[in-house]
Regions:
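Short loop/turn segments at strand-loop or loop-helix junctions that form parts
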Residues: 1-10, 73-75, 114, 146-148
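Substrate-binding cleft of secreted/luminal carbohydrate-active enzymes
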Residues: 107-175
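Active-site groove signature of glycoside hydrolases
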Residues: 1-24, 45-51, 56-57, 70
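Glycoside hydrolase catalytic-domain groove-lining segments
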Residues: 60-119
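Aromatic-lined carbohydrate-recognition surfaces of secreted/lumenal glycan-active proteins
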Residues: 1-2, 31-58, 107-119, 145
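Substrate-binding cleft/loops of secretory-pathway carbohydrate-active enzymes
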Residues: 51-73, 121-132
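Short catalytic/ligand-binding loop motif for oxyanion handling, primarily in non-cytosolic enzymes
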Residues: 3-9, 56-58, 79-80, 118-119, ...
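Long, well-ordered alpha-helical scaffolding segments within enzyme catalytic domains
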Residues: 24-39, 90-106, 122-136
Length: 175
């Protein structure tokens, strides 16, 4: 099975991607055009719609005929968590808001980009998938770990987070 996608994090307002935060109808039309064009040449291809998971993500949904699965971006950045939430968040706390917004489409959900950056204790807690009851996220089918240094600056002077799995925390990455 092959999956294609286009225009990830289209609902993001942070200005990191030139295609994000378009007028929703413009994005939907462009996404549908992409899928229609691909289907002509690769009819067996499936399509992943990959929002950031913001409150208005539904406005960017291109419709059930254009989405086979949903891919969410989920990142845990300790300095951001402490500033925005007053403390460290675990895997479930990071995923829940965007998952809850995406589950209403009743499509399989993947975390198409996942990473944690912070001290060893934070990264261990963030990566502990075994601490989550699978019943809490029944549509979640897989996770792709984004093990790289962020290519672009994060807002609010957070710099370029380092999402790489390191020897001191790789034993805490649990299935």
């Amino acid at each position: 099975r092959w999956t294609g996608g286009w225009g990830r994090e289209m609902d993001s307002k942070n200005g990191r991607y030139p295609w994000s935060d378009w007028y929703p109808a413009d994005f939907v039309n462009a996404y549908r055009h992409f899928v229609d064009t691909c289907r002509v040449h690769a009819p067996e291809l499936e399509f992943m719609w990959s929002p950031r998971g913001e409150r208005d993500l539904a406005a960017f949904y291109p419709g059930d005929d254009y989405v086979d699965e949903i891919g969410l971006s989920v990142f845990g950045l300790q300095p951001y968590d402490n500033l925005a939430f007053g403390g460290d968040r675990d895997f479930a706390e990071l995923l829940k808001p965007s998952y809850d917004r995406a589950k209403k489409f009743k499509k399989p959900i993947f975390i198409s980009e996942f990473g944690c950056s912070g001290d060893t204790a934070y990264v261990s807690k963030c990566n502990d998938f075994s601490a989550v009851d699978p019943k809490q996220f029944p549509l979640l089918e897989g996770i792709v770990y984004y093990s790289a240094v962020e290519p672009g600056e994060w807002p609010a002077s957070f710099g370029k987070p380092d999402w790489r799995v390191r020897p001191e925390n790789e034993t805490t990455v649990k299935p």
